[in-house]
Amino acid sequence: MNKSTLAIVVSIIASASVHAAEVYNKNGNKLDVYGKVKAMHYMSDYDSKDGDQSYVRFGFKGETQINDQLTGYGRWEAEFAGNKAESDSSQQKTRLAFAGLKLKDIGSFDYGRNLGALYDVEAWTDMFPEFGGDSSAQTDNFMTKRASGLATYRNTDFFGIVDGLDLTLQYQGKNEDRDVKKQNGDGFGTSVSYDFGGSDFAVSGAYTLSDRTREQNLQRRGTGDKAEAWATGVKYDANDIYIATFYSETRNMTPVSGGFANKTQNFEAVIQYQFDFGLRPSLGYVLSKGKDIEGVGSEDLVNYIDVGAIYYFNKNMSAFVDYKINQLDSDNTLGINDDDIVAIGLTYQF
């Protein structure tokens, strides 16, 4: 693979924000903006997942150098639906909004709407062209993905002592004034990852424990004062190959019809190969199995094979197709959609 193509692909995959356009950098103050336009269409027999799914994401990252040891920073990111009527008030949502301080070699501390500690593991397989990352990770579901009220401490290279050993400690304040499936009580989470001093192989683990709300315990399904989850993952990223997998379990946390699953067992895997002419085929699998669900017993909540590909024209423009081959039974007790979905589209990002 030639070096210029490799640099483009690595930067795209690592994070959308790495394309940020620097709008200000002077006297220790820096401001970058980033975003993407995803023009996308779903094809499915499931009506709510058939049709235009286009959206725009936009954000900024800023930092200020307070002194040679201390830096302040903030980040905001929002998404705007491109398939809604202009009069629809639901067309915009805030994905990230946090600010914090970073002390050299000690770590960073921030507060706001951020990514939960469990997602530090789950993110390794959330690499499909469109789908994926939805077995145990769900937005505003305790600390499994993006969530509100998160106080987060992150330390890289373990205080400068161990290269590649990263640590996260996180606290989440209660959020009760919302839909019951998006509520949470006070909770704590942690994650750790290690790449063996910069090797191509890495391992990770995470654990979260939260109080559940009174309203959650009144639901027909899923009882218990605590919501708990753990996850462990491995990945390999070298020689144009990306392979990652993780296993996780949740207790009284994952939403189902009528409440929550008392237990879930979750597995995800992805393998991708980067060709030097810009094509990146992808093969993945996602499974979430609910256990001990009242009136149901055991039931697959998510189960699909994912086949897709991305073609990078350059660092800013790409085309993709992603086929979600649903493996759920059509007569599943919880009434979960079992239809396949094909996503196709173009992405421009900066």
Swiss-Prot record:
GO terms for biological process: monoatomic ion transmembrane transport. One of its GO terms (molecular function) is porin activity. CDD domains: gram_neg_porins (cd00342). GO terms for cellular component: cell outer membrane; pore complex. Induction: By phosphate starvation. Keywords: Cell outer membrane, Ion transport, Membrane, Porin, Signal, Stress response, Transmembrane, Transmembrane beta strand, Transport. It is found in: Cell outer membrane. Its main location: membrane. It is a multi-pass membrane protein. Disulfide bonds: none annotated. Coiled coil: none annotated. Pfam families: Porin_1. The keyword Hydrolase does not apply. Residues 1-20 form the signal peptide. The keyword Transferase does not apply. Homotrimer. Uptake of inorganic phosphate, phosphorylated compounds, and some other negatively charged solutes. Belongs to the Gram-negative porin family. This is Outer membrane porin PhoE.
